[in-house]
Amino acid sequence: MATVRKAFPQRLVGLASLRAASTSSMGTLPKRVKIVEVGPRDGLQNEKSIVPTPVKIKLIDMLSEAGLPVIEATSFVSPKWVPQMADHSDVLKGIQKFPGINYPVLTPNMKGFEEAVAAGAKEVSIFGAASELFTRKNVNCSIEESFQRFDGVMQAARAASISVRGYVSCALGCPYEGKVSPAKVAEVAKKLYSMGCYEISLGDTIGVGTPGLMKDMLTAVLHEVPVAALAVHCHDTYGQALANTLVALQMGVSVVDSSVAGLGGCPYAKGASGNLATEDLVYMLTGLGIHTGVNLQKLLEAGDFICQALNRKTSSKVAQATCKL
C-alpha cells in the first residue's frame, strides 16, 4: 500500500527544479507576464447563491496581498440580468486600493459607466463578441449595433481619462454557432482597438479551443492588432486552458486572464466550465522562469478562503496537489 506524504511547509517543493529546466526548445517566451485576475467578477457572477459583500471585499484584498497587478473587481450590469453583481458600488468602494494595482470593472453601457465612475472606478471594460448569434442572445443586438452602444462609453472614458479594456468573446468557438472564423475575431479585435481600447482580451468563452485553433486565431489577429495590446482569456472546459495559454506566450502575448481557484464560466454559454486557475498559471509561469510578481502561497490562501466561503472544491490542480492532508 502506497504511503501518502504530507505536504512540506512551503507546499511547492518542485518549483526550484522546474525553474532550472531548459526552455530553449519552447521558442521565445516573455520575461514577464501580467496576470489579470478575473475571479471576483467573472469567477463569481454565475454562482447561484449570492456571495455576501464582505466576502467579495476580503477576497479582493487577499488577491491584492498576493501581488496580482490587475484584479477585475465587479460588474456594473443590471441586477436583473446578473443579480450576483448588484452590490458593485459597495464592493468597489469597500476594497483596499493597493498602490500599483488596477481594479477595472465591467461597464456594458453608459448607465453602468456613470455608476462605476461615481463609485471610484479608474479603469473599465467593455465586451464584444466574434459571434453574431452570441451577441444577439447576450445583448439583444448585432455585433455592429453593439459597437454603436460602446461609442458613448468610449467618448466619456476619454473625457474622464479612464482606460478601457476590450473583450472579444467566442474567439475560439461559440455555444450557438460552433466554429468562429479567425478573420471575424481579428475584425472585432481591430474595431475595439481602433475605438481606443488599450488592451484586447481574446476569450475562449466555452473552452473548446485547442493549441492549433489558438495559433490560427492569433495569427489572424496579429495582422490587425499589436501583440503588446493583446491578452488571452481561456476557459478549461476541455482541459486545454494551460496549453492554449502557452501557445499564446510562444506567439508573444504577455498578458493572461485567469481566475483564483478556477472559478467562473459564462451565464450565457451552455456547458462552459471554469476559467484557467490563477494558481496553475502562476505555477507554470514560475517553472518557465517567467516573472509574475505573484506570491503563490498567498494566492493559494485566497483560493482556500473563497472556496470555503462558497462551500465548494477548488478547480486548481496546484491547490489540490498542495493541500494539507
Curated annotation (Swiss-Prot):
Keywords assigned by UniProt?
Acetylation, Disulfide bond, Lipid metabolism, Lyase, Metal-binding, Mitochondrion, Peroxisome, Transit peptide
Q: Which GO terms describe its biological process?
A: acyl-CoA metabolic process; ketone body biosynthetic process; L-leucine catabolic process; lipid metabolic process; liver development; mitochondrion organization; response to fatty acid; response to nutrient
> Where in the cell?
Mitochondrion matrix; Peroxisome
| Signal sequence coordinates | none
Which positions does the record annotate as the modified residue N6-acetyllysine?
Answer: K48, K111, K137, K179, K324
| Domain Pyruvate carboxyltransferase positions | 33-300
| Binding residues for substrate | R41
Instruction: State which pathway it belongs to.
Output: Metabolic intermediate metabolism; (S)-3-hydroxy-3-methylglutaryl-CoA degradation; acetoacetate from (S)-3-hydroxy-3-methylglutaryl-CoA: step 1/1
Keyword Repeat included in the entry's annotation: no
CDD domains for the chain: DRE_TIM_HMGL
Please provide, alphabetically and separated by semicolons, the GO molecular function terms listed in this UniProt record: carboxylic acid binding; fatty-acyl-CoA binding; hydroxymethylglutaryl-CoA lyase activity; magnesium ion binding; manganese ion binding; metal ion binding; structural molecule activity
**Top enzyme class:** lyase
Where is motif Microbody targeting signal found? 323-325
Task: Mark the residues carrying the PTM N6-succinyllysine.
Answer: K48, K137, K179
Q: What InterPro entries does the record tag this protein with? A: Aldolase_TIM, HMG_CoA_lyase_AS, HMGL, PYR_CT
Q: What is its EC number?
A: 4.1.3.4
Which residues are the active-site ones? C266
Give me the reactions it catalyses: (3S)-3-hydroxy-3-methylglutaryl-CoA = acetoacetate + acetyl-CoA
UniProt: a divalent metal cation binding residues? D42, H233, H235, N275
- Which portion of the chain is the transit peptide? 1-27
Q: Which domain of life is it from?
A: Eukaryota
By sequence similarity, the record places it as follows: Belongs to the HMG-CoA lyase family.
Q: What does this protein do?
A: Mitochondrial 3-hydroxy-3-methylglutaryl-CoA lyase that catalyzes a cation-dependent cleavage of (S)-3-hydroxy-3-methylglutaryl-CoA into acetyl-CoA and acetoacetate, a key step in ketogenesis. Terminal step in leucine catabolism. Ketone bodies (beta-hydroxybutyrate, acetoacetate and acetone) are essential as an alternative source of energy to glucose, as lipid precursors and as regulators of metabolism.
Subunit comment: Homodimer; disulfide-linked. Can also form homotetramers.
What protein name applies here? Hydroxymethylglutaryl-CoA lyase, mitochondrial
